[in-house]
Structure formats: C-alpha cells, structure tokens
Amino acid sequence: MGGREGNPVFARQDTTIFTVMSSLATKHGAINLGQGYPDKDGPLAIREAAARALREGPNQYPPMTGIPELRTAIANHDAHFYRVEFDPKSEVVVTSGATEALADSFMALIGPGDEAVIIEPAYDSYRPMLEALGACVKSVRLEPPDFRLTEPMLAGAFSNKTKLIAVNSPLNPVGRVFDRNELELLAAFVSRYRAYAVCDDVYEHIVFDDYEHIALISLPNMRERCLRIGSAGKMFSLTGWKVGWVTGPEPLVRLVANAHQFNTFTTSPALQLGVAYALENEMNFTLSLTRELQAKRDFLIEALTRAGFGVFPCEGTYFLTADSSKLTEESDRIFCERLTREAGVAAIPFSPFYGQDGPSGLIRFAFCKGMDVLNEAANRLEKYFSPVAPR
C-alpha cells in the first residue's frame, strides 16, 4: 500500500465474522444459523405501505431527523410500552439502521481521551466505533454460566473519566435480559460518575417466559442520561430496510442529530412511511413473533442438547449460546468452520464478541429461521455428532 497508513483502528480489523461465516455457509451449502436474520419477510401490509409510498412519492430528501409520521409513531411506541414521553419534534431521530444510531450516539458523546464502558460479550461494532473516536474502552466482562452484572464488575470499569456505557438488553449474543436490580445498579453508577448510557434496545420485544424488558431510560433520574436505540428490522422481520432510531432528552438528541447529518443525513422516505404504518398497526405481529421464537428456542435447545452441546438459558433475543467443550478441544472459530464444512450447519464463534481472551468453547446459534430449516439443522447436527458417524 503506497502513501501513509489509514486509520489504525480499521486497518487492524478483519472482515466481520458474520460475513465470513455466511460466505462459508454459502460456499458449502450449509444451513446458516450464524447471522441473525429471519428467513421470512415481515407482514405484507407493511411492505405494501412502503411500496405505495415509493410509487406515489415524494422520493426526495425527507426531513433530516425523520418524517413527522414516523417520529410521532416512535414517540407513541415508547410512551405506550415504557411510559416515557418524548417530543417527536425534538427528541427523536430516525437513522439508517440501529448501527448508524449507535455510531451517531457515540459521536455525539465521546471525545478523544474519554473512557467508554462496554459489557462483554458485546456486539462487535461497539469497540471499533468507540476506538475510532479516540475513546479508551473499558470492558465489564460477564462470566458464564449466568452472565450477571455485579457491583464489583462495574466498579472496576467506571472512573472519573467515564463518559458513557453501552447497554444492550436483551443482550446479544448470550440472551440475558437484565433485571431491575442490575439496571438499578447500572443507573447508580451512571449517576454517580455523571456519565451517559447508550441503550441498545433493538431486541426489546423479543423476551421469553416471564422475563420483562425494562428500559433503563424509564428508571428514576435516567431520562436525562440515556439515549435509547430501536430497530424496525428486529421488530418487524425487515432487517434489510435498515431503519432505526434514537430517542432521548433534547440536549443529547440534538447532538445525535448533528452527528447524523454528517453520516447518512437521512433515510428512505418510503421505508420510513412503511415503518410508521407498522408501529401504528402491526405490533401484534411483533408480539406473536416472540411467541413463535420461544417455541423455536425450545426446539433448538433440545436439538443441541441431543447433539452433545451444553446450552445456556436464553431469556431474550433470537440467539442461543452453546458450549462445545464436550465435543472438541478446538478453538471456537476452528470448530465453527469445521461445523460449516462437514456438518453443514453454520454458527458464530464467541471470541469476536470479546476484546481479547474470550471464553473457549462457546458458540452462538440463531433460531430466527423456519421450523423446517431448524429441523434440518437439528438432523444434520445429530447425525454428525452421532457416535457412529464417520469423521
């Protein structure tokens, strides 16, 4: 490469593990239980609303912070589910996906030398985004088997330089839903250190059994210290639309909007109208989807257990965490690559969800697929790990 080097944060990044494993799955004709996207699109009525808007127009730049219909629908959603009121004119920003919402929020709050806390295992975008902004990233490392937040963990990560903590609940990849005690502990540290919380709530409605997603922003004194991120793709099985949003107090959202205008500036008006329709008319789909996913979770837990994996509890998201230590001594990545090539089932190794020294033997399976797909994956795994199966 001629000339001077590029940004060292991105120069040292490999292709994301999700792209790598999906490409490997395609190459070997494997069932892809790695990347977390449904294999069936969301409701036709939502897609028709977007198609109608595309045909009828206008198809020019919409307002930078989002069309009024969608901003109002988002504010109504948060008021209904969390009893937190936001002004749609000044406290909502629509983004091109939740990952852009994360980037905008980090850009709005972080300056060079600030400290940012992430909870590991963590979505793999957090660390490089923050480091590219000049942040010093501290990690709170949750430990199996329960992956719970504790006061000593947070005390070891927070300092007087802490500017923000990224909070993902339900937590990808382990499926934890932080309970009220854990969230109150988080809130206490955020307040004590006068920090902010960027709440990655994209799996907010995918919560199982008797667990409840509690929005951190709804806790006492947290409204002024939180930015809350949502995702239409996760709610309505429309991940390719890449429509997300940020809600929060006006002073913080104004900074998010300033960052957003220099990133994507805006998002397709037709897709925004489709999502506005969905939030106002199709939330029953989202709630019924969660019931379907719970049945699929239970099916895959049984299938993985029969194949010889240890399986951790899953309280939310559409991912299962499996322990392969009784099946192999290989690294998680080598094992996942072999599983894809030889068993015909792709999964995601856990190590990319940690900055360094992730736990050995853990892998992530997505169960947001059709039952026929999950059944075939179960058959392949059971056959491959059968004691009489050839190796």
Where are these regions (language model features)?
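Conserved PLP-binding catalytic core of the aspartate aminotransferase-like
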Residues: L293-Q294, A307-A343
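PLP-dependent enzyme catalytic core of the Aspartate aminotransferase-like
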Residues: A155, R338-A347, P352-R391
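A short helix->loop->beta-strand "cap" motif at the edges of active sites that frequently abuts
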Residues: D114, A135, R192-A195, R223-E224
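Conserved core segment of the aminotransferase class I/II
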Residues: L219, R223-Q294, D298-A307, K383-A389
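Conserved PLP-anchoring active-site segment centered on the Schiff-base-forming lysine
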Residues: A108-L130
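A short helix-loop-beta submotif of the ANL/AMP-binding
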Residues: A132-K138
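N-terminal small-domain helix-loop-helix segment of the aminotransferase-like
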Residues: R4-G97, D104, M153, A278-N281, ...
